[in-house]
Amino acid sequence: MALNMRVSSSKVAAKQQGRISAVPVVSSKVASSARVAPFQGAPVAAQRAALLVRAAAATEVKAAEGRTGKELGQARPIFPFTAIVGQDEMKLALILNVIDPKIGGVMIMGDRGTGKSTTIRALADLLPEMQVVANDPFNSDPTDPELMSEEVRNRVKAGEQLPVSSKKIPMVDLPLGATEDRVCGTIDIEKALTEGVKAFEPGLLAKANRGILYVDEVNLLDDHLVDVLLDSAASGWNTVEREGISISHPARFILVGSGNPEEGELRPQLLDRFGMHAQIGTVKDPRLRVQIVSQRSTFDENPAAFRKDYEAGQMALTQRIVDARKLLKQGEVNYDFRVKISQICSDLNVDGIRGDIVTNRAAKALAAFEGRTEVTPEDIYRVIPLCLRHRLRKDPLAEIDDGDRVREIFKQVFGME
C-alpha cells in the first residue's frame, strides 16, 4: 500500500511539473492566415512533427472542466431571454450581432442591477446548437475551411472523414484577472525541444471560437488585453509566438462587453472597435418594476416550470434568428440609402468609415430579422444610434444625448419629422 501511494504521488508530481513547465506567452498577435515556424537545430523528423498542432491540456483536467460546467449548468438555470422585460435596445443589439457576427460585437453600458449579465447569458442559452469536429479544442467547423484549425485542415487534405458532433454555442466568460497567456494560449517550449512537437494549450480565445466571449466590467480590463480581444474579433484569427515557434488558430466570436460608466470609460480608440454601443438605464415605470420582481421571484421558486412557460416563445425566437441568418445573404441597402448613411456620418464628424460599414450591416440584419431583404428608412433609424453614438467626439458642454443627436441628424438627412 505504501509503495502504491508513493508511486501515485510521484505521478501526480510529474503531472504538476509538466503543467508548470508551460512557458507563459510573451507576445501574441492576430494573423490573417495560419503559419508555422519550425525551430532550428531539430532533426528532420522533429521538424515534420512540428507541423502538427496538438492540444497540450491534460485529459483529466478537460474532463473535470466539462463536468464542472455541466454541473453548474444544471445547478444554475438560465433565465429565459423572452421573459426579460424592457431593455429593448440591448436585446436588439445582441440579436443583430448573432444574425451577423461581422457587425463587430456590442458594448453595453448601464447602471448596476439592470440585467446586463442576465440578458447576455440568456442569449447564449437561446441560440441553436452548432456542428463541430468531434474532440477538437477549437470548435472547428466540419465544412468551412476558414473556421477550421490547422490540424483539421490537414486531416481534410489527407482525405480523412471527420467525425462530427453537435454542441451548444459556447459562452466564455473572461475574468478581469486573466493573464495574456490564459487568453491567447500557451506553448510548451520544453515539449517542443524534447519531443519535436509544438504542444499548444488553447486559451479562452480558442474556446470562444464560433461562440460568444463575454467580458464583464470591460472598462476595468487592461488595455493590452482589450487590444488582443478586439484584434482577434476583427480578423478572426489568433497567433501565438514564442522562441521561433508560431501557432495560429481561428478565433471568430461575438465580443460582448459590459460596464458601469461610473467606474470609468473605455479609451475612444478602443470603444470605436466595438460595432455597436447600447446604453441601458434602470426601469422607472413602477408597474414594470413590479412585473420584473414578480417574474424573478417565480423563476427562483421553480426555474423549470418558469422556463416551461416561455418554451414556445424561446423556440419561435430561435427559429426567427435561424431564418434571418439565411435571409441575410439576400439583403440589400439601395444606393440612395447608403449615400445618406455616409452623409449622416460626415455631418456628425465620425472618424473613419467603421460607422458607415457597421450601420449598413446592422440595417440588413434588422431587415432579415423582420423577414425582409430590402432595407427601409425605419430599419436604419432603429440601428444607427447603436452604431454611431460611441464614435462621436465628446462635448462636455453638450445638453443632448449622443443617441438623440444621431436621430436628429438622421431626420434632417432623410427629410423625416
Curated annotation (Swiss-Prot):
Catalytic activity: protoporphyrin IX + Mg(2+) + ATP + H2O = Mg-protoporphyrin IX + ADP + phosphate + 3 H(+)
Disulfide bonds: C345-C387
Alphabetical list of Pfam families matching this protein: AAA_lid_2 (PF17863), Mg_chelatase (PF01078)
Binding site for ATP: G110, D111, R112, G113, T114, G115, K116, S117
Keywords per UniProt: ATP-binding, Chlorophyll biosynthesis, Chloroplast, Disulfide bond, Ligase, Nucleotide-binding, Photosynthesis, Plastid, Transit peptide
Listed GO biological process terms: chlorophyll biosynthetic process; photosynthesis
Sections of the chain in a coiled coil: none
Transit peptide range per the UniProt entry: 1-54
GO cellular component, one term: chloroplast
SMART domains: AAA
Lineage top rank: taxon: Eukaryota
GO molecular function: ATP binding; ATP hydrolysis activity; magnesium chelatase activity
Subcellular location: Plastid, Chloroplast
Enzyme Commission designation: 6.6.1.1
Main location, first listed in the record: plastid
Pathway(s) it belongs to: Porphyrin-containing compound metabolism; chlorophyll biosynthesis
Activity regulation remarks: Redox regulation; active in reducing conditions, inactive in oxidizing conditions. Thioredoxins f and m mediate the reversible reductive activation of oxidized CHLI.
The keyword ATP-binding belongs to this UniProt entry's keyword annotation: yes
Annotated family: Belongs to the Mg-chelatase subunits D/I family.
Subunit (UniProt): The magnesium chelatase complex is a heterotrimer consisting of subunits CHLI, CHLD and CHLH.
Name the UniProt record assigns to this protein: Magnesium-chelatase subunit ChlI, chloroplastic
Annotated source species: Chlamydomonas reinhardtii (Chlamydomonas smithii)
